[in-house]
Amino acid sequence: MRHYEIVFIVHPDQSEQVPAMIDRYKATLAAVGGKIHRMEDWGRRQMAYMIDKLAKAHYVCMNIECDQKTLEELEHAFKFNDAVLRHLIIKTKKAETEPSIMMKEVQHEEARKSAQSDAPVAAA
């Protein structure tokens, strides 16, 4: 089996459906003995350029190990899911299990926001 990194971008109006999509893709992999080494939900982020007049979208990254047939099934599912705006599949040499740079940035932003909300409000 080969290792792949998959990033897919979901329409922002369908963000609440992302966990169900992820579960469906996990089930597809599990049915044939594939493995998920890393699953990251990057959340709603600004896109580099507009797609279908949208400036923001929901990003998900998966590092998986599967055979070619399963990869084709996943790609087919991405193509025919109207909520998926774009997808990218990259073959990697080994399994990536540590958090990606994007996920570290997301965690940093969340920590910064929680620190700001916990800070006492200065009296004016």
UniProtKB/Swiss-Prot annotation:
One of its GO terms (biological process) is translation. It comes from the Bacteria. Residues 105-115 have a biased composition (Basic and acidic residues). Keywords: Ribonucleoprotein, Ribosomal protein, RNA-binding, rRNA-binding. One of its GO terms (molecular function) is small ribosomal subunit rRNA binding. One of its GO terms (cellular component) is cytosolic small ribosomal subunit. Residues 105-124 are annotated as: Disordered. Signal peptide: none annotated. Pfam families: Ribosomal_S6. Coiled coil: none annotated. InterPro entries: Ribosomal_bS6 (IPR000529), Ribosomal_bS6_sf (IPR035980), Ribosomal_S6_plastid/chlpt (IPR020814), Transl_elong_EF1B/ribsomal_bS6 (IPR014717). SUPFAM superfamilies: Ribosomal protein S6. Binds together with bS18 to 16S ribosomal RNA. NCBIfam families: S6. Belongs to the bacterial ribosomal protein bS6 family. This is Small ribosomal subunit protein bS6.
